[in-house]
Amino acid sequence: MILGIDEAGRGCLAGSLFVAGVACNDQTALELLKMGLKDSKKLSLKKRFFLEDKIKTHGKVKFFVVKKSANEIDNLGLGACLKLAIQEILENNRSLANEIKIDGNTAFGLNKRYPNIQTIIKGDETIAQIAMASVLAKAFKDREMLELHALFKEYGWDKNCGYGTKQHIEAITKLGATPFHRHSFTLKNCILNPKLLEVEQRLI
């Protein structure tokens, strides 16, 4: 059985970071692939929520989602929050899988304690369990930002999901940051260095 891990909200200026872990066998993963499972960034919002429901209600799928708030990211740092979230998933699910696959190029040093960890760049495009984790994390992030958009409509969170789009940056410059913005280096840097917008927009 494979445990796949992925995140959503890493490059955002607002809202939480969500890290998800999904464990299932290859046969179950194939069932989800036949339903249209792929990297969450290539799915519509409606399709992500549809697959989220299928993953969460499937009897042979085990999942775990960890949320790290904007406040935690400001206080601890993004890297520390990612490591803590992945560690929490591993501590709760390591007995479920003999293989652990994380999207990206770093295991944040956790491979010393969990030697069966494998990091895979663009793993959400090649490993079904990582794609499933990607869908869950992104669906949780989508839902959070839609709820926050109802409170702060000027920032366009229903469209940009907290990323640093032109509209979002302009709203921050004009209205200031909300309690749900990350008041750390990322936020300040994006306002002072507009060139970073291109990088942030690619992450949407």
UniProtKB/Swiss-Prot annotation:
Keyword Nuclease: yes
Swiss-Prot/TrEMBL cofactor(s): Mn(2+); Mg(2+)
Subcellular location field: Cytoplasm
EC numbers on record: 3.1.26.4
Signal peptide region: none
GO cellular component: cytoplasm; ribonuclease H2 complex
The record's free-text note on cofactor binding: Manganese or magnesium. Binds 1 divalent metal ion per monomer in the absence of substrate. May bind a second metal ion after substrate binding.
InterPro entries (UniProt xref): RNase_HII (IPR022898), RNase_HII/HIII (IPR001352), RNase_HII/HIII_dom (IPR024567), RNaseH-like_sf (IPR012337), RNaseH_sf (IPR036397)
Keywords of this entry: Cytoplasm, Endonuclease, Hydrolase, Manganese, Metal-binding, Nuclease
Reaction(s) catalysed (UniProt annotation): Endonucleolytic cleavage to 5'-phosphomonoester
Domain of life: Bacteria
Pfam families hit by this protein: RNase_HII
Protein task: Endonuclease that specifically degrades the RNA of RNA-DNA hybrids.
Name the UniProt record assigns to this protein: Ribonuclease HII
Native source organism of the sequence: Helicobacter pylori (strain P12)
